[in-house]
């Protein structure tokens, strides 16, 4: 990649920092860095564009762009119609990537709300685990619809508190990505939740899982940060209790349904 003008990072969240650092040590040219991982730094809790920015050689970085939106690679490779966002604070950089990737079956929009988009794409993975747990536990469409709707409320509440824009969560980076990740068998997060809900045995799943399930780490980061900021995240809290505190999935579902009654908004 030493002579590249554009470098795409397609690695797990925990590898983004080291990979980006090595990229800037190798490349000769000033480059656009594209990131497709979703989540937060496991220690600092930084968003991934911030992680990349901290290790970037400023003289070699033209822009950091995240590709975010409802997109499963299994469908893109088959040229199924897909729409996503090129997300960057540098709108011109986002437009470069927009035009590079757009074609007859893959349409790219731009979005400069990096905070909102990066937070949304991490939280939707947590909601996908929750959606899978519901499905694995034998719940139906009604429950999943409620989960996605209330999950969107958590997503926007958390993101706006950090400076994200509410309208971002009504677009591809919010409700769009939430729908596809919470309903698709292609989603590793959904399938992880499904297995946990079906077996009611999170310990065995965690021991045997060999796939990258970004929502597991994201859940811990979001839960911890929400606690510090006193942000109400009831679904996230229950997913955290299942993943990290040994709570049974069925008990978590029951506790959500037994919360104090209130107006929706």
Predicted regions and their residues:
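Rossmann-like NAD(P)(H) cofactor-binding subdomain of soluble oxidoreductases
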Residues: 2-79, 97
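Structural signal for hydrophobic packing residues in well-ordered secondary-structure cores
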Residues: 5-8, 27, 44, 56, ...
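Internal alpha-helical scaffold of NAD(P)-dependent oxidoreductase catalytic cores
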Residues: 15, 26, 51-63, 81-168
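Generic structural signal for well-ordered, non-membrane alpha-helical segments
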Residues: 16, 41, 45, 49, ...
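Glycine-rich beta-alpha junction loops
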Residues: 38-40, 68-72, 88-90, 112-117, ...
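NAD(P)-dependent Rossmann-like dehydrogenase/reductase catalytic/cofactor-binding core
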Residues: 124, 131-135, 160-170, 174-265
């Amino acid at each position: 990649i030493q002579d590249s003008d554009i470098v795409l990072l397609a690695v797990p969240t925990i590898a983004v920092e080291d990979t980006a650092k090595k990229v800037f040590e190798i490349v000769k040219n000033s480059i656009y860095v594209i990131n497709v991982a979703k989540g937060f730094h496991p220690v600092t809790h930084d968003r991934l564009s911030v992680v990349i920015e901290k290790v970037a050689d400023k003289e070699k970085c033209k822009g950091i762009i995240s590709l975010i939106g409802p997109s499963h690679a299994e469908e893109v490779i088959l040229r199924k119609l897909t729409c996503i966002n090129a997300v960057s604070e540098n709108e011109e950089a986002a437009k470069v990537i927009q035009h590079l990737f757009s074609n007859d079956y893959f349409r790219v929009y731009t979005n400069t709300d990096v905070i909102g988009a990066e937070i949304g794409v991490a939280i939707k993975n947590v909601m996908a685990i929750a959606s899978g747990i519901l499905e694995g536990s034998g719940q139906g469409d009604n429950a999943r619809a409620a989960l996605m709707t209330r999950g969107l409320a958590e997503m926007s509440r958390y993101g706006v508190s950090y400076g994200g824009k509410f309208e971002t969560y009504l677009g591809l980076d919010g409700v769009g990505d939430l729908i596809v990740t919470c309903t698709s068998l292609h989603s590793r997060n959904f399938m992880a939740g499904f297995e946990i809900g079906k077996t009611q045995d999170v310990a065995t799943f965690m021991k045997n899982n060999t796939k990258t399930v970004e929502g597991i780490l994201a859940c811990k980061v979001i839960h911890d940060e929400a606690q510090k900021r006193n942000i109400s995240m009831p679904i996230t809290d229950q997913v955290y209790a299942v993943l990290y505190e040994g709570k049974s999935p069925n008990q978590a579902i029951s506790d959500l349904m037994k919360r104090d009654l209130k107006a929706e908004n």
